[in-house]
């Protein structure tokens, strides 16, 4: 089994190191991750400059680009064979609801999915979190299940793991994405040189967090597994649009 592992926290993050060690028990692991923290990079590609691929002393590869760059470069330009699975994580902090739109962790897995490879995005729902070992064990269990019973077509799964000991997890459930309120307003400040600067505000509280959502599952101590789709079509509006365009 050939695994391509990436993240958005950077190649030096504890989460990717722990997951790489775990996945090595199941197959060959290639790590290609950003050279620095690129949280919130979403699905952006670097188009204004060339990318450089370097190798760290621990054998990991790092790129001066985004998480999407890392997976795209690895699959289309670095690896001799397409990986059997792309895994992004383990992220330090949850990626639930609207977070998935901005998340570099989810974006790296999305790129693998777009390239035809089954892909997982894995996040520990706490920052920094105390139980990376739990997230590693959950990921390995899901990977084994995918190896034993593969889906009929490439699948993109977003996994969020409660920050608790493995034996305290209540189970694993299929969920849909919840939704947050809008983010808090930007914070205006002045830097030491007297320039006015702005910090993006914190994520808003969960708004749609009822039963069946990823927020609810994690809050109740369950691992949340949400299948994601790339189709952004608004089908409800699509049904009404022809009559609106041609009254």
UniProtKB/Swiss-Prot annotation:
Disulfide bonds: none
Keyword vocabulary terms for this entry: Cytoplasm, Hydrolase, Metal-binding, Nucleotide-binding
GO molecular function, one term: nucleotide binding
Cofactor-binding details, from the entry: Binds 1 divalent metal cation per subunit.
Cellular compartments annotated: Cytoplasm
NCBIfam families reported for this sequence: PRK00346.1-3, PRK00346.1-4, surE
Family membership noted in the UniProt record: Belongs to the SurE nucleotidase family.
Name under which the protein is recorded: 5'-nucleotidase SurE
Species per Swiss-Prot/TrEMBL record: Laribacter hongkongensis (strain HLHK9)
GN (gene name): surE
